[in-house]
Amino acid sequence: MTRAPSGPGVRAALALAMASALILLGARPSRAEYTLQQSTQPGAHYHSPQDFAVQVTFGPYRPDVDSEFSMPRHPYLDYFGDGKNLLTQAQFDYQVFHKMGTVAIGLGAGFFRVSGSSPVASNPAQPSGDRSTLTVVPVSLSGVYRFDYYLERDGFPIVPHAKLGLDWAYWQITDGNGEIARAAGGRARGGTLGWHAAIGVALVLDFLDPTAARDFDVEMGVNHTALVFEFGHYDISGLGRSNRMHLGDDTWTMGLMFEF
């Protein structure tokens, strides 16, 4: 068997090769460091994977309870007045398609509560000392389309969107003691099915501070932060079923959205 060459020259060459390899491996950046270096180079654009969106919005809401009653009956007006109160909503989107815009499936939930004085039975226009509270918790499943093609290509910050979906809203009425009220031999709570359609627009805030937006993406994976405005028609009246509490409204909401 031929013996491998050895000697001072060979050993020196091997030592030099090993030292060079160690230096190169030690100097090589990790994937995250490489990404950060690339993203901070002049003119570079970093974009982490984008699969989800979360938005939180607020807006005025007045459930259309009185639409199911014939005149002159208007129990919501008698109990809670004709004003609108705050509706808080949150939605989580799973983005399934990115080409000429973004298509997503969204799951949302909201919360609304209003309190008022019960009217005197003999004179509905006169409030009594008894308090009643209506609580509504709407849940929605939506198909969402956002036209963000020019945002991704050119950084244009205005992104319109459209939404269509189904709703189910839980409702309950409690008395002044916080207990579920009773009416017509039953308990004053239930659920109503419905549907909604909405259009809106988002102002993506990345342009205000591109460096901070890029760092937010690199470090936290948040691709975009945006102000969102939306106007929607909510028909939550039972999808044709009778004897359901009507909880729909035409209203607007505004809030923040994060894509990641």
Name each region found by the language model.
Residues 1-48:
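Cleavable N-terminal export/targeting peptides
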Residues 32-95, 238-246, 257:
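Short glycine/proline- and aromatic-enriched beta-strand/turn motifs that initiate or cap beta-hairpins
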Residues 58-64, 109-115, 147, 166-174, ...:
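Transmembrane beta-strands of outer-membrane beta-barrel pores
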Residues 63-84, 112-139, 170-193, 240-246:
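Extracellular/periplasm-exposed beta-strand and loop segments of Gram-negative cell-envelope proteins
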Residues 43-50, 95-103, 148-158, 206-225:
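Short loop/turn motifs that connect adjacent beta-strands in outer-membrane beta-barrel proteins
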Residues 200-260:
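Predominantly the C-terminal beta-signal and adjacent terminal strand-loop region
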Residues 42, 56-58, 88-96, 107, ...:
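Residues on the lipid-exposed face of transmembrane beta-strands in outer-membrane beta-barrel proteins
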Residues 89-176:
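Gram-negative (and chloroplast) outer-membrane scaffold detector with strong preference
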